[in-house]
């Protein structure tokens, strides 16, 4: 069992909590007492960036509501409130359906905050949903925006799923079947990114945004990664671009300006020792041995030690 207690203005002191466990027949099968100490202090504003990927499609699927509907935005609002409450201040923002953790050739439910129209080969964009999303982040105290990845995972060869109304027909125009370095997507990014960044600046949130190309470029697809990065970078001048990167040699070559390093990377000591403007760290499902994580089967000290490590190594 995991039990959270809300102080709700209680005076500092020690409060006994008694927990009883009953079976389906209402027979008591266990009992424990816990003395909860409330100290006379509040945590200050978080001094680091903290993000967990926030998937709006999962909210829609789990609750059975139409994505981008009023009901969906109401739920997103509630989830954002909890997200912020747990100390998260940077949120994945799906300008297009995030191409994350998706089997090659398959799709996630469409979660696209930017409306795309193509008429006689010319693109135009609607940003009302994106503005509504950003307003909810402001309402809930989420300061920073992590713009969804511009290319697919595991090779960066393809485009994210993008839906558009083309000469009156609503359909998918990019996805696993379109090349990330192809002329069609180049043309699209050249039209889209200037419009997006202009809106972010007009709304006063540009300085709080981070952009992604794709995760973990490796030796095998490094040329493709660099080509795609160079497609986007001219339109993102002044914005910070960050990606998961665990090969220190690639950082030395300037492949990624703001690398996010796996906590079990063999090159982590090199990253920690480097003179970097920001030091980022991540863990996901593969960090199972020797490092911190928050798997439910782990003892809680393996989770809590992360705070000490972030402080010790001055992680951003």
Each PLM stretch: what is its role?
Residues 1-9:
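Short, hydrophobic beta-strand segments
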Residues 6-7, 16-23, 31-235, 244-253:
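Aromatic-lined carbohydrate-binding surfaces of glycoside hydrolases
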Residues 11, 74-75, 125-129, 224, ...:
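Short, glycine/acidic-rich beta->alpha junctions
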Residues 171-172, 242-266, 280-282:
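Aromatic- and acid-rich polysaccharide-binding/catalytic face
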Residues 258-316:
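Catalytic-core region of carbohydrate-active enzymes that cleave or remodel glycosidic bonds
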């Amino acid at each position: 069992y995991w039990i959270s207690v809300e102080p709700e203005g209680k005076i500092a002191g020690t409060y006994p909590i008694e927990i009883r466990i009953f079976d389906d027949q209402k027979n008591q099968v266990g009992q424990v007492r816990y003395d909860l100490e409330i100290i006379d202090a509040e945590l200050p504003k978080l001094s680091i960036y903290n993000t967990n990927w926030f998937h709006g499609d999962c909210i829609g699927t789990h609750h059975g509501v139409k994505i981008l509907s009023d009901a969906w935005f109401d739920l997103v609002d509630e989830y954002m409130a909890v997200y912020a409450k747990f100390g998260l201040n940077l949120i994945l923002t799906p300008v297009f359906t995030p191409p994350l953790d998706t089997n090659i050739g398959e799709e996630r439910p469409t979660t696209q905050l930017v409306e795309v129209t193509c008429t006689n080969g010319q693109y135009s964009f609607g940003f009302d949903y994106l503005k509504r999303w950003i307003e909810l982040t402001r309402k809930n105290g989420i300061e920073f925006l992590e713009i969804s990845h511009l290319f697919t995972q595991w090779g960066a060869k393809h485009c994210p799923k993008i839906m558009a109304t083309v000469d009156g027909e609503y359909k998918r125009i990019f996805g696993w079947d379109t090349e990330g370095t192809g002329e069609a997507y180049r043309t699209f990014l050249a039209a889209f990114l200037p419009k997006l960044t202009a809106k972010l600046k007009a709304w006063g949130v540009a300085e709080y945004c981070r952009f992604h190309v794709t995760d973990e470029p490796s030796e095998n697809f490094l040329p493709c990664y660099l080509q795609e990065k160079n497609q986007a970078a001219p339109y993102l001048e002044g914005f910070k671009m960050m990606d998961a990167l665990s090969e220190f040699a690639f950082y030395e070559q300037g492949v990624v300006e703001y690398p996010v390093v796996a906590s079990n990377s063999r090159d982590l000591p090199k990253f920690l020792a480097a003179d970097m403007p920001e030091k980022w760290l991540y863990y996901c499902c593969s960090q199972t041995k020797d490092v911190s994580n928050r798997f439910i089967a782990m003892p809680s000290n393996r989770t809590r030690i992360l705070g000490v490590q972030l402080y010790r190594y001055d992680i951003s």
